[in-house]
Amino acid sequence: MADVLPLVEARLRTALGEPDARAAVTFLGTDRIEVLRFTDGDVVRYATLGMSAQPMADPTAVLADPVKGPRAELVLSVRRGVADTDKVLRPLAVLAASPQVEGLIVAPGASLDVGDPLWPEAPFTSVLVAESGGLVEDLELDAPADPVRFLPLLPMTPNEAAWKRVHGAQALQERWLTQGTDLRDPARTSVPLD
């Protein structure tokens, strides 16, 4: 199969405009992961580029299929000027490399934890993976390859992550919705969970 990354970058540019910054990270034993930054008014979006180069594989499979399997990139949207969110580049690259490093299949409803604040003084150490298809449409690839999904990431506080483990992703998203939580606020506090 042809290299999908130029198609992925074109889809990101079509949906989000021209990136105003990009950084690349390479971890030992993994392909290069780039993080592109797109600014739109008071919102800045960070999108990974490189996670979808290979399909995610079931870690229990004897051989990984080089064509079939889910493919994804990650997109994080936050308000500008509230916190130094550009430091999220490395944690995002770590999350994007997790399918190659840990054999993890990243899918909606999953929690991804980096163990440290996503950026300096951030109240968030993990993210909830949301459904694709909203901000950036899925990218169809030639059969038999699965489409590339652009999965939004919703930052979670440690308390929200613990609550999500007990009650589920949908319950946490409903809690955020009923409380009117601004999920793009990089300095927001945990939603009331009682």
Language-model segments: what does each one mean?
Residues 1-71, 75-194:
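Acidic, proline/glycine-rich low-complexity IDRs
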